[in-house]
Amino acid sequence: GLLQTIKEKLESLESLAKGIVSGIQA
């Protein structure tokens, strides 16, 4: 459903943000 799609997109954005942050800190 729509909520599942939104949840998956939020999770992928979160992991992307974490990757960017760790890239900045490295």
From Swiss-Prot:
- In this UniProt entry, the residues modified to Alanine amide are 26
Biological processes per GO annotation: defense response to bacterium
| A GO term from the CC aspect | extracellular region
Q: List the disulfide bonds.
A: none
The entry's function note states: Shows antibacterial activity against S.uberis.
Q: Where in the cell is it found?
A: Secreted
Question: Which tissues and organs express this gene's product?
Answer: Expressed by the skin dorsal glands.
- The keyword Cell cycle is assigned to this record: no
Q: Write the lineage as a comma-separated list.
A: Eukaryota, Metazoa, Chordata, Craniata, Vertebrata
Which regions span the lipid bilayer?
none
Q: Which residues form a coiled coil?
A: none
Q: What name has this protein been given in UniProt?
A: Maculatin-3.1
Q: Does the keyword Signal apply?
A: no
Q: What is its main location?
A: secreted
Q: Which keywords does the record carry?
A: Amidation, Amphibian defense peptide, Antibiotic, Antimicrobial, Secreted
